[in-house]
């Protein structure tokens, strides 16, 4: 199930940069090694790329992570992901780094204060 939450009226939403299907396909294939998205992934990514606030409720293992990882490579700015599971943070950041996305990081309670400061400084 996919639910869209549109807080900003569409007429007032900032214009999303034009991202064509070829760019999306290139990121999917080159960075993530996949040939195609699942239908609901495609729908979620299209909504995000169009600048819509989007909430995706999908089954475990469906590939929700790609729904924010792909747009993060195509849109300007910083992507913030909030997760209650430190192990999941580790897995996702390590997976992104292995794929060459080296600006991925995490902030959580397992880090020493100096590590947090260093990572926050790198984000700025």
What are these regions (language model features)?
Residues 39-124:
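Conserved P-loop/Walker A NTP-binding site and adjacent catalytic elements of P-loop NTPases
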């Amino acid at each position: 199930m996919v639910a869209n939450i549109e807080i900003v009226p569409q007429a007032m939403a900032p214009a999303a940069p034009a991202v064509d299907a070829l760019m999306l396909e290139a990121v999917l294939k080159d960075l993530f090694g996949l040939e195609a998205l699942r239908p609901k992934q495609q729908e979620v990514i299209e909504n995000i790329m169009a600048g819509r606030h989007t909430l995706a409720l999908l089954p475990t293992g469906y590939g929700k992570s790609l729904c924010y990882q792909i747009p993060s490579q195509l849109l300007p700015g910083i992507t913030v992901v909030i997760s209650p599971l430190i192990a999941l943070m580790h897995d996702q950041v390590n997976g992104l780094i292995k794929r060459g996305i080296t600006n991925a990081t995490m902030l959580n309670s397992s880090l020493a204060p100096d590590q947090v400061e260093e990572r926050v400084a790198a984000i700025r």
